[in-house]
Amino acid sequence: MKRIIFIILAVAAIMAGSVSCQKDNVISGDPIVPQGEVTREFLSQIRVGKDGGFQYWYQDSPALKELKAFVATVTDPNCKGYVPPQDRVATFDVDGTLLCETAPYYFNWMLFFHRYLHDSTFTPPEKDRQWASQAEAYVLANRKSDKNWGLKQQELQAIGFRGMTDVEFSAYVSNFINNESVVGLSNLKWGTALYWPMIEVVSYLVANDFVVFLCTGVDRDVCRVIAEGIYDIPKYHMIASDVNYVLENQPEWVEMISSEDYEYTPGEEVQRGDFMQLSTAINKIIKMRRELGQKPILSWGNSSGDYPMFHYTNIDNKYPHISFCLLCDDMKRELGNEDKAKNCKTDCEKNGWIPVSMRDEWWTIYGPQVERN
C-alpha cells in the first residue's frame, strides 16, 4: 500500500512539473531598513537574485506571482515558452513606475520650475519667467497642468539648459535630486524618491538575463542621472525625450543635412541644443521600433500614456509576453489618485494586463520613515 501511495505521489509531482515551469518561491526574512535617512547608496544595494528573495513585496502578491511564473517560463530551456536571453527585452516607464510621479507634479516640470524660478545662476527672458511662474502656481494648486502646456514646457526647459555639456548637465541634475525635497512626503529627496519594490523587480530581471530599457517621457540625460548606480542598466538603454546636440562652435544654420559643411575642431565640446522630440504615448512605440528593432516581451507602466507600449508588447508578439500596470492607489504612503487607479484597473481587466496595487501588494514604497505631510 505504501508503495502504491509513493508511486501516485511521484506521478503527481512529475505531472505538476510538466504543467508549470515555475520554481518554488523564495521568501526572505525581515526586510532591511536603514537607520536614519535613506541614501542612494542604500538604494544601490537593493538587489534580488535569480531565484527571487523579494523583501519589499508581500509574498502573496498576485502580481509578484505572475512575474515569477513568467520569468520561470521564459528562462527555462525545457519550457515551450523559453525565450533566448538576447530577446528577453523589458521596457519600463519612469514617472509613476520607478520614480515618484506627482509630488506635486512630474519630475521634468519640477526641474523646469527650479531652473526658471529658483536658480540664481540663470536669468530667463522675462516673458518665459512669467509663463513659468503662472504654470508653477497652477501646478502647485491643482497637481496637474493644462494639456496644451507640455510642448512649451519641454521647449523652454531645453532652452534653459542649452549650451551645457553632458558633464555640466549631469552635475546640475545630480545637485537637484540630492538637495531638493519632494513636496508632500517627509524625509524624501528626489534622488531617493524611487520605489523600493520596483528596484527589486528590475534587479530580478537583470539577474535572469533580461535586457532592460527605460522607456519614458523624461529627458534622456535626466533619466541617465536618476538611474545611475541604482539599476544595473547601461546609459545607452534609455529610450526617452530628446534634445538636439551641437558642437560648441557650430553655427546655428548647420543642421544634420548640411553637417558635412562644418569642419570639426578636435577637442570641441558637444553641447545641449534645442528640444527635439517627446517620448510619450505613441512616440514610445516609434522610438522602441527605431532603437530596439524588436518588441519587448515585458513592459511595465502606470497610466494611459503607457497603453501604447502595452499594446505593442502584446499584439503579434512571437514570444510569450506580459504587461504590468502599477496602480497609484496608496493614499497613506504615497500621493495616490484613487480615480486614476480605478480606471487603470478597469483597463487592465479589459486588456489582460496585470494590475499591481501599491497599497495591497507592497510592504513599503520609500521606506517606513517616509510619510505624507
Task: Identify the residue ranges that each predicted region occupies.
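Bacterial N-terminal signal peptides
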Residues: 8-16
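Bacterial Sec-dependent N-terminal signal peptides
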Residues: 17-37
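Acidic side chains
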Residues: 24, 93-95, 306
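Alpha-helical substrate-recognition element adjacent to the catalytic core
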Residues: 33-254
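C-terminal cap/substrate-recognition subdomain and adjoining C-terminal extension
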Residues: 36-53, 171-373
